[in-house]
A protein has these predicted regions:
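Hydrophobic, Leu/Ile/Phe/Ala-enriched alpha-helical segments that form helix-helix packing faces
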Residues: 38, 42-50, 166-169, 209-217
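Conserved structured core elements
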Residues: 12-16, 33-36
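Short glycine-rich, low-complexity/disordered patches
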Residues: 48-59, 175-182, 218-220
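N-terminal topogenic membrane-targeting module
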Residues: 25-99
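Feature marks short, highly hydrophobic, charge-poor N-terminal signal-anchor/signal peptide-like helices
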Residues: 1-12
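Terminal, regulation- and interaction-focused segments at domain boundaries
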Residues: 17-27
């Protein structure tokens, strides 16, 4: 009986080891393909004059910093974090904690952003992000593509411009947080990226920066 138990245990360990190895190679390949695709697609749209990449370790993503210095776009930065598809054990946990791949855009225009505005998808953050002077901002709930967003703003027209931007993207519900922050002069977008639509969405972010951030109410 003991010999049978040991044999069964060995078989289970062997199967898990084999599955882990297979998952590692398949998941690593997919994540590398995704990273390469996002990098090429975004770079093709932004066309930086200088670029810098920082590997985040393993196969979970990278950070990119682009110097653009064209039109209203001074710098275009983003951080891509992918689910650990190469890890059989950690991947299910990440699906519960991280939930999906993420891309964080930090866009720095030449024009000065004058007022604070945020759209935050309700229920997305487990811990609410710290927003400076939040108590002085107007607050309301709006709906975009069937999802509720908490809107925080100084002037309603700022929020309306952000709402129109989100609605114009390929899959608006993928946008989790979009904001304009005067203190850092940053236009920020957190979203779930999609390989099929990333190029079109980045084009719209660049167009918004070049056209809308130059106009009232943001820069005057």
């Amino acid at each position: 009986m003991r010999t049978m138990d040991n044999a069964t245990l060995f078989a289970i360990i062997f199967v898990i080891a084999g599955a882990s190895t297979l998952q590692f190679y398949k998941g690593r390949k997919l994540n590398l393909q995704l990273m390469q695709h996002y990098l090429r697609s975004i770079e093709e749209v932004v066309k930086p004059e200088d670029k810098d990449y920082v590997w985040l370790g393993g196969y979970i993503g990278f950070r990119a910093v682009y110097k653009v210095n064209r039109d209203n776009l001074r710098k275009f930065e983003y951080t891509l974090t992918l689910l650990p598809r190469h890890s059989l054990l950690y991947f299910p946990i990440a699906l519960l904690t991280s939930r999906h791949d993420k891309i964080y855009f930090v866009i720095r225009p030449f024009a000065e952003i004058k007022r604070e505005a945020h759209l935050i998808q309700k229920g997305y953050y487990r811990l609410k992000p710290n927003i400076e002077n939040e108590e002085f901002l107007q607050r309301e709930t709006i709906e975009i593509a069937g999802r509720e967003y908490e809107a925080l703003y100084e002037k309603k027209r700022d929020m309306v411009k952000l709402k129109k931007l989100v609605e114009s993207l390929s899959k608006p519900h993928n946008v989790k947080h979009v904001s304009l922050t005067p203190k850092t002069n940053v236009f920020y977008v957190l979203m779930k990226p999609e390989p099929e639509t990333i190029e079109k969405d980045v084009e719209k972010l660049v167009r918004f920066t070049n056209e809308k951030l130059r106009e009232s109410p943001f820069s005057s």
